[in-house]
Each structure stands twice: as C-alpha cells, then as structure tokens.
Amino acid sequence: MNSKIIYSVLVAFFISIITGPILIPLLHKLKFGQNIREEGPKSHQKKAGTPTMGGIIFILATIISMFILIKNPSDEAMFAMYAFIAFGVIGFIDDYLKIARKNNLGLKAKQKMVLLLIVSFAFAYYGANNPEIGTSIIIPFSEKTLDFGIFYIPFIILYFAATTNAVNLTDGLDGLATSITILVMTFFVIVSFNMGHYTLSVFCAVTAGALLGFLKYNAFPAQIFMGDTGSLALGGAVAAVAMILKLPLVVIIVGGIYVLETLSVIIQVISFKLTGKRVFKMSPLHHHFELCGWHETKVVSVFSIVTVILCMIAFLSFK
C-alpha cells in the first residue's frame, strides 16, 4: 500500500491529538456539557457535564489533513468530505440546542429528519447525475451490479438517513462509535485503494487517523463525547464513501454493529407497542449488555472484535 496512506493516518492522528487539549478545556469553559437522559443506565448519570461536540476535533483534523496532503483533491474525495461536513453541521445544530435548552432535547424528531432528508437528497441527486457514480450498485458475493434507475435517488436518500441515524444510535458508550468507525474506515481505505480511488482512500485514512487521535480522549472514561456533531458526520462519511464505490450493501456487512443497534431499537419499540413487553432490558443493544452486567469496555471490545470479523467477511464478498 502507498506510503502516503500511512502518512495520512499519522498526520490526522497528531492533529487530532494536538486539538484535544485545546478544545476540551474550551468546551468546559463554555459549559458545553452533555445532558444525560434520566431513563438511561444509572451508571451514566455521573457522566453529566462531560463536554460534548467533540466531533469538532476529528472533523477539523480530517479537513486540515486533507488540504495538507492533497493539493488537488478529486471530486469524489471532496464529495465525501462535503457529506462529512454537511451532516456534521446538522449534528452541531442539534448539540447546540441541547446545551442551550439545558436538556437532552435538541432538534425535534421531524425537524432533524427533514434536514437529514434534504441533505441526503442533494447527495443522492449528485450521485445519480454523476457518470462516475451512476445509479447502479454492486451486489456482494457476486460479480453483478443492480441498476436502480429512477429508484436510485429515493434509495440513496433512505440509505443516507438510515446510516447517519444508525451511527448516531451506536454512539452511546465511551469509545464505541469511534472504535467501530475506525475499523469501518480502515476497511474502506483498503477497498478504495484497491479499486483505484486513491484520493478517496486518503480521505478514509485521514478520517481513521483523526478518530484514532480522538479515541485518546473518548475512550473510557471519556473526557469528551463526539455528540451528534461527530456521529452524524461519521454516518455521512461512511454513507458517501460506500456510495462512491457503489457499495451501499456492503455497509450492511461491515457496519453490522450499526445495523444491530438500529434493529434493537426498532424491535423494542414495536414489541412494546404491540405486547406491552420489552425484548431487551434497554435499547440500543449496547445498553442491554450493560444491564446484563457487562462493563462498557467489554461491550466496546466485543463489538469491535465482531466488526473485525464482519470486515473480513466483507472482503470475501469481492469476487
């Protein structure tokens, strides 16, 4: 693999490491602390006041690294970075409103979904009308592609909305979403490089490197949370990269933890509405394992191991 990929990881890592000690005290000073849901695990109540919006750290590290390393980024790399930033902005607005209102209620669900759908439409429309991306996607474990035609735009809109929300739901334990997304982005570094998308592989590498640096401050016990600023940005980046590579279906495999977290919430809600009973002790899934007696670090470790296995399976899907 090109040595530039290694440099990309290292540059972003060190920028993220340097940014942390600057931003964390600033957020403390501004009293940008996380409000913890009362209905969440009792062990999480002590986390109240931990600075949020930490996604700013790895977003800045990624942007700065890209402009340091690549003088003329390709359209596809810029597309991924625009998605990264655009969804991050929605998350930032949500985080800011939560802090301003001093509760865990930021944007209303409908407001947030409308913003996500509008931004998703913009990227879906661009992709459908870009000959380098087109309206077809690769079917895993086969040499075939599926052309969505006129259904491509609605499919991609739902795909972006689902991916961003899934990463957002996964961000419930110290270092969980960070660790999982480092592995997912590492997978896409290798795949995009092997498919000839070199500048896109650099984007994936700097994102992974920036997250590695951020993990120093986000791992248990977290000094800062990424907030919706970070989780929505990461969801947008993962969705955009996979869309460019025509691999939205592969995200279901490598992002299996994202999928399970989301399904656990859906199953919990449907079960409670239909039967009045809960399938899980608490959703999303990571909280269920917490209430089963698992420590946060064990949940993160096991989910990360599962993601490594899923990435290996995803590699086998390429013929």
Swiss-Prot record:
Domain of life: Bacteria
EC number: 2.7.8.13
Membrane topology: Multi-pass membrane protein
Main location: membrane
Span of the signal peptide: none
Keyword Transmembrane helix: yes
Pfam family, one: MraY_sig1
Cofactors that this protein relies on: Mg(2+)
CDD domains assigned: GT_MraY (cd06852)
GO cellular component: plasma membrane
Pathway the protein contributes to: Cell wall biogenesis; peptidoglycan biosynthesis
Gene Ontology MF terms in the entry: metal ion binding; phospho-N-acetylmuramoyl-pentapeptide-transferase activity; UDP-N-acetylmuramoyl-L-alanyl-D-glutamyl-meso-2,6-diaminopimelyl-D-alanyl-D-alanine:undecaprenyl-phosphate transferase activity
Compartments reported by the entry: Cell membrane
GO BP: any one term: cell wall organization
InterPro entries: Glycosyl_transferase_4, PNAcMuramoyl-5peptid_Trfase, PNAcMuramoyl-5peptid_Trfase_CS
Record's catalysed reaction(s): UDP-N-acetyl-alpha-D-muramoyl-L-alanyl-gamma-D-glutamyl-meso-2,6-diaminopimeloyl-D-alanyl-D-alanine + di-trans,octa-cis-undecaprenyl phosphate = di-trans,octa-cis-undecaprenyl diphospho-N-acetyl-alpha-D-muramoyl-L-alanyl-D-glutamyl-meso-2,6-diaminopimeloyl-D-alanyl-D-alanine + UMP
Transmembrane region(s): 5-25, 50-70, 77-97, 113-133, 148-168, 173-193, 195-215, 224-244, 247-267, 298-318
Keywords, in A-Z order: Cell cycle, Cell division, Cell membrane, Cell shape, Cell wall biogenesis/degradation, Magnesium, Membrane, Metal-binding, Peptidoglycan synthesis, Transferase, Transmembrane, Transmembrane helix
Family: Belongs to the glycosyltransferase 4 family. MraY subfamily.
Function, in words: Catalyzes the initial step of the lipid cycle reactions in the biosynthesis of the cell wall peptidoglycan: transfers peptidoglycan precursor phospho-MurNAc-pentapeptide from UDP-MurNAc-pentapeptide onto the lipid carrier undecaprenyl phosphate, yielding undecaprenyl-pyrophosphoryl-MurNAc-pentapeptide, known as lipid I.
Protein's UniProt name: Phospho-N-acetylmuramoyl-pentapeptide-transferase
Organism: Clostridium tetani (strain Massachusetts / E88)
Lineage start: Bacteria, Bacillati, Bacillota, Clostridia, Eubacteriales
Gene name tied to this protein: mraY
